[in-house]
Amino acid sequence: MLNVTITDSAQTYLRELLEKQACEGIGIRMFVSNPGTPQAETCIAYCRPGEAEEADHVMELSGFNAYFEDRSVPFLDEAKVDYAPDKMGGQLTIRAPNSKMPKISDDSPIEDKINYVLYNEVNPGLASHGGNVSLERLTDDGMAILRFGGGCQGCSAVDMTLKQGVEKTLMERIPELAGVRDVTDHSDKSNAYY
C-alpha cells in the first residue's frame, strides 16, 4: 500500500513545471536510488507517456499522475513532498524517513539483499580499519561487482578480506549470488591500512 503525501502546494508547483514541458500526459516518477543504504537518495523525475513501468504504483492527482517505482515503495513509506514558496521562488522538499532503512524480505531484489549485508554486517568490521565496500552493480549472471574504499583501497590484505570475509559472508547470506568480483584500483595505496 502506498503511503506517500504530496501536499497541495507541491502539487501546484509540480503541475506548473509539467505544463511547461508541453507534453500531453506527462507526470512525475518517484523512486529511491540505493534504497536501504546510507547513500539512499529520493528522486523525482519527469515521466513521459510510455516511460512508466508496468509494476509502478500510480497516484492520480489533479492535472497529472505520480508514478512510484515498485521496488522503492517500502522505502517511500511515510514520505512527504512539500513546496514552500519564498522570495527566491521556493523550494521543493522531499522527506523520506525510511529511504535509508533496510527493508529486506525473501522477495527483495538481490541488489537490496547485497546492500543490506554489506552495510549492516561487512562494513562495520571494515570501518575499524577506515575501510568500506559497496556494490557497483550486479551482472546478468548473478556476480556482485564490488568496490573497496577508504583504508581497504590499496591494502595488501584485501584479497584475504574479499575471499574470507566479504565473499564468504555474502555467499552464506545470499545463496542465489553466483560470486563476487573486486573492481577497485588497489595500486593507489595512499589511504591503505596495511
UniProtKB/Swiss-Prot annotation:
Pfam family, one: Fe-S_biosyn
Any one GO BP annotation for this protein: protein maturation
InterPro entries tied to this protein: Fe/S_biogenesis_protein_NfuA, FeS_biogenesis, FSCA_dom_sf, HesB-like_dom_sf, NIF_FeS_clus_asmbl_NifU_C
Entry binding sites for [4Fe-4S] cluster: 152, 155
Cofactor(s) listed in the protein's UniProt record: [4Fe-4S] cluster
Keywords associated with the record: 4Fe-4S, Iron, Iron-sulfur, Metal-binding
Cofactor note: Binds 1 [4Fe-4S] cluster per subunit. The cluster is presumably bound at the interface of two monomers.
Any one GO molecular function term: 4 iron, 4 sulfur cluster binding
Superkingdom of the source species: Bacteria
Family that this chain belongs to: Belongs to the NfuA family.
Its job: Involved in iron-sulfur cluster biogenesis. Binds a 4Fe-4S cluster, can transfer this cluster to apoproteins, and thereby intervenes in the maturation of Fe/S proteins. Could also act as a scaffold/chaperone for damaged Fe/S proteins.
Subunit structure, interactors included: Homodimer.
The protein, known as: Fe/S biogenesis protein NfuA
Gene it is expressed from: nfuA
